[in-house]
Amino acid sequence: MKTNLIIGTRQSLLALWQSNHIADLLRRQYPECTVTLKKIITKGDRILDVPLAKIGGKGLFTKELETALLEGEIDLAVHSLKDMPTVLPEGLCLTAVTKRANAGDAFVSNKYASIETLPQGAVLGTSSLRRKAQLLAARPDLKIVDLRGNVDTRLRKLDDGQMDAIILAAAGLTRLGYTDRIREIIPHNFCLPAVGQGALAIECRTDNTEVRAMLNFLNDQPTKQATDAERAFLGLIEGGCQVPIGVHAVTEGDAVSIEAIIASLDGSTVLRDTIRGHAVNAAELGKELGNKMLDQGGRAILAEIM
């Protein structure tokens, strides 16, 4: 067994919380192992004045960590699963997916209790095309502005009065101790979450069998099956930050149910469908749902966007 592990992590408070959480679990499981963190800046962290959809490319928050993995500078990388591309670089693998926290989006406001109580023309901040499209579908009167930066920065912009409300991932707020800022967990029939939202992903080198074996205990099989379905759907659609796609899968015993949306940028068209089947076939079901939705009009929506 390896007696020294180096975890690669982004430098944001949320990323450090997540990586320290994994480090603590590893130390508890392997008391004789020394676990340290190596902070790495990613492209997504450096470019904060441009909407994610306009930066383009995949792996905005993962590529530099993956380079460090491949070059042997770190033994594993901790990511928010929603940030991970569906296709990984050759030589790397998704070793474990942790038990999912709340996968939903959180409505945060100092004035209003829910999206439904926002006044006409209210200003709402979010960095996600997925959220924007779904929110505009329900509330086309809202003025949605781009919101970048870490969680603290986004909350500060709200508190400074720059907007009436913001939308953030519920899991991130909870992990950083901001549960009291959540006014509402947005229902999935209003806004489906991003692929993998709420789960942490552990990535390492494929040939590092020793480290992979040490990380097995971190994997939560129900979460892994559900997110495999979501990632298979996304991979088939070939969508990233540039496409408004929401998908959420839930395992119940040996079954999995998947719900997904493909939307136009302005929310004027939202295609929604579901599928259910055996959890062992989760990835295949995700692809099946993706193909079905492409044939039902999703392909036309994507053609307009791309």
Name what the model sees in each region.
Residues 2-48, 54, 62, 137-306:
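Small-molecule-sensing regulatory modules
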Residues 68, 84-89:
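Extracytoplasmic loops/domains of multi-pass membrane proteins
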Residues 81-84, 171-173:
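Short glycine-rich anion-binding loops that position phosphate/pyrophosphate groups of nucleotides
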Residues 74-78, 164-165:
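Short, Asp-centered acidic motifs that coordinate Mg2+ and/or phosphate
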Residues 81-82, 90-142:
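A conserved helix-loop-strand patch within extracytoplasmic ligand-binding domains
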Residues 50-75:
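Short, structured active-site "lid" loops
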Residues 72, 120, 161:
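Structured loop/turn residues at beta-strand edges in well-structured enzyme cores
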